[in-house]
From Swiss-Prot:
EC number: 3.1.1.86
EC class name: hydrolase
Species of provenance: Emericella nidulans (strain FGSC A4 / ATCC 38163 / CBS 112.46 / NRRL 194 / M139)
Active site (UniProt): 26, 204, 207
GO molecular function: rhamnogalacturonan acetylesterase activity
Record's function text: Plays a key role in the degradation of rhamnogalacturonan in the cell wall. Involved in degradation of pectin.
Cystine crosslinks: 100-108, 226-244
Family membership noted in the UniProt record: Belongs to the 'GDSL' lipolytic enzyme family.
Primary location class: secreted
Protein name: Rhamnogalacturonan acetylesterase
Domain of life of the organism encoding this protein: Eukaryota
Chemical reaction(s) catalysed: Hydrolytic cleavage of 2-O-acetyl- or 3-O-acetyl groups of alpha-D-galacturonic acid in rhamnogalacturonan I
């Protein structure tokens, strides 16, 4: 795999010609194992997987992780942004990840770890990150979150949650590419059937094992091909089963 896993983005070699940066949570992260590293063999450029478990769009922003990517990326690089699994909840018992309710410029005031914080909405955090990367000349792709196990109840069921729509809205507002990763993953999971898909989730209904993450990666790549977004230009594989959605 052509993959870069760094503890500090400052260590990234500046000589790399082109890189795909991945920003997300545990469903994408290397250590889980998430799907991010599994696209490496299907692209012609390097992967820098900066996804980290337990993060939301808010906490990734507060920790300076979007800015850290912006500080090292070069014009022509790609950034894939995918969040949503950790963005729900209530600010009344603030876990540091929950976003302000709404889909626009609403704000909420909170105190987290003894520090006052103005909390933005999910679309605002994602849009701000996309605009930050655009200013650096990057090709930005916002991706909807992966589904929880749609076979968990014994019958296939997939209904996109609000963060899927919010991700698409943020992409529209920022003027960047969007793929519905969740829908493509759900479609493939429906075709594979309950027994196979249930085996992908050995611990809980959110995190796939290595085999499942490989399938989720293929779903992402298929979404890229079918959507005709800029990232398609660096794919070395475009032969995915099934029709486009």
């Amino acid at each position: 795999m052509k993959s870069i896993a760094l503890t500090s983005l400052s260590l990234l070699p500046s000589a790399l010609a082109q890189t795909i940066y991945l920003a997300g949570d545990s469903t994408m992260a290397s250590s889980t194992p998430g799907w991010g590293d599994y696209i490496a063999d299907s692209v012609s450029v390097e992967i820098s997987n900066q996804a980290i478990g337990g993060r939301s769009a808010r906490s990734y922003t507060r920790e300076g992780r979007f800015q850290a990517i912006a500080d090292v990326l070069q014009a022509g690089d790609y950034v894939v942004i995918e969040f949503g699994h950790n963005d729900g909840g209530s600010l009344s018992n603030d876990n540091g990840r929950t976003d302000c309710p709404g889909d626009g410029d609403e704000t909420c005031e909170t105190v987290y770890n003894g520090v006052a914080e103005t909390v933005l909405t999910f679309p605002a955090y994602i849009e701000n990150a996309a605009l930050l990367f655009l200013e650096k000349g990057a090709n930005v792709l916002i991706s909807s979150q992966t589904p929880n196990n749609p076979w968990e109840s014994g019958t296939f069921s997939y209904t996109p949650n609000r963060f899927v729509g919010y991700a698409e809205l943020a992409a529209q507002r920022a003027g960047v590419d969007y793929v519905d990763h969740g829908a493509y993953t759900a479609s493939i999971f429906e075709a594979l059937g309950a027994d196979t898909v249930n085996s992908f989730y050995p611990n809980d209904h959110t995190h796939t094992n290595a085999e499942g993450s490989s399938v989720v990666a293929d779903a992402f790549l298929k979404a890229v091909v079918c959507s005709g977004v800029a990232l398609n230009d660096v794919l070395t594989r475009t032969d995915f089963d099934g029709e486009c959605l």
